[in-house]
């Protein structure tokens, strides 16, 4: 199960799409960073034998998203956390998503640049296992301590390096935010399932 968790977490920036809104028209209007500033959070939900919680904080041109794994259904007991911090947030042209909801949704494309990528373990058994197996090429894992994993190979995946540019799209619906990121190009759709819903805190 741990190996499955590693693979799923490493790819957390590429959401599994159960329902999505496809991007459509863009306009000449440019959105501003302030419309998505704040702290956002998904519901606590089951994922690969654990319970997952995603959080996003946007402040100025900084963007930090975390994927937390917990051992209880209320997401109160920490297990692991992956955190990515980006800078240079730049919002592009406004967009309309005709396939989102009954009246469509509004949003925009944006770009950000990776500035930090960390992994934190809150379970002593997993700390021991990771040290034994040199997970991410690291043998000095410490409980409750974030480790830099940018550019490292963790399991079968090599994580992105600092300075990597990401291309994103978001949909804003009142207090609900949906978004997607890719280091290759803008995705064609945005996940809008219940577990992809970030609610403003």
Locate predicted features.
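Intrinsically disordered, low-complexity segments enriched in glycine/proline and serine/threonine
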Residues: 5-6, 25-26, 192
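Sec-dependent bacterial lipoprotein signal peptides
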Residues: 1-19
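Contiguous, well-ordered beta-strand patches that form the walls/edges
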Residues: 43-51, 66-175, 180-201
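N-terminal segment immediately downstream of the Sec signal-peptide cleavage site
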Residues: 31-63
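Bacterial Sec-dependent N-terminal signal peptides
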Residues: 13-39
């Amino acid at each position: 199960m741990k190996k499955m968790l590693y693979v799923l977490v490493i790819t957390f920036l590429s959401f599994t799409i159960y329902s999505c809104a496809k991007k459509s028209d863009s306009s000449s209007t440019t959105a501003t960073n302030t419309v998505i500033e704040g702290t956002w959070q998904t519901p606590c939900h089951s994922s690969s034998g654990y319970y997952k919680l995603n959080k996003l904080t946007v402040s100025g041109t900084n963007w930090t998203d975390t994927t937390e794994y917990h051992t209880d259904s209320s997401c109160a007991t920490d297990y692991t956390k992956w955190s990515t911090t980006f800078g240079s947030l730049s919002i592009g042209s406004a967009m309309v998503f005709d396939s989102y909801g009954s009246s469509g949704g509004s949003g925009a494309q944006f770009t950000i640049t990776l500035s930090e990528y960390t992994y934190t373990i809150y379970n002593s058994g997993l700390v021991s296992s990771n040290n034994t197996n040199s997970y991410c090429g690291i043998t000095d894992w410490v409980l409750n301590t974030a480790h830099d994993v940018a550019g490292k190979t963790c399991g079968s995946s090599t994580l992105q390096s600092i300075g990597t540019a990401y291309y994103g799209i978001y949909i804003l619906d009142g207090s609900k935010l949906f978004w997607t990121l890719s280091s290759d190009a803008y995705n064609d759709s945005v996940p809008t399932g219940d577990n992809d819903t970030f609610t403003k805190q």
